[in-house]
């Protein structure tokens, strides 16, 4: 069963562009990871939201321990208002299967 993750990242205002650049540099490598079905960065005025979908909990676990995130850590050091808020979700299917879940 797929696993959905929503991560909220709040960059310090003076580092916003650098944080976005770090993510855009990392995203292609994550897209190539086994089990990555979606890894999409979104933004509003003060925060970034990463919406992820993984083929399984094992795929998510491998991602969280993988080289792409390990390499990204130093690029984000000192540039965030605090740790990312990461929420791991299971779908509650409802209505049309194509529209009722990620």
Each language-model region and where it sits:
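Glycine-rich beta-strand-turn "strand-cap" elements at beta-sheet edges
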Residues: 2, 40-46, 74-102
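Short, well-ordered beta-strand segments in beta-rich or mixed alpha/beta enzyme
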Residues: 3-9, 40-64, 102
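Short, surface-exposed ligand-recognition loops at beta-strand->loop->(often short) alpha-helix junctions
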Residues: 9-19
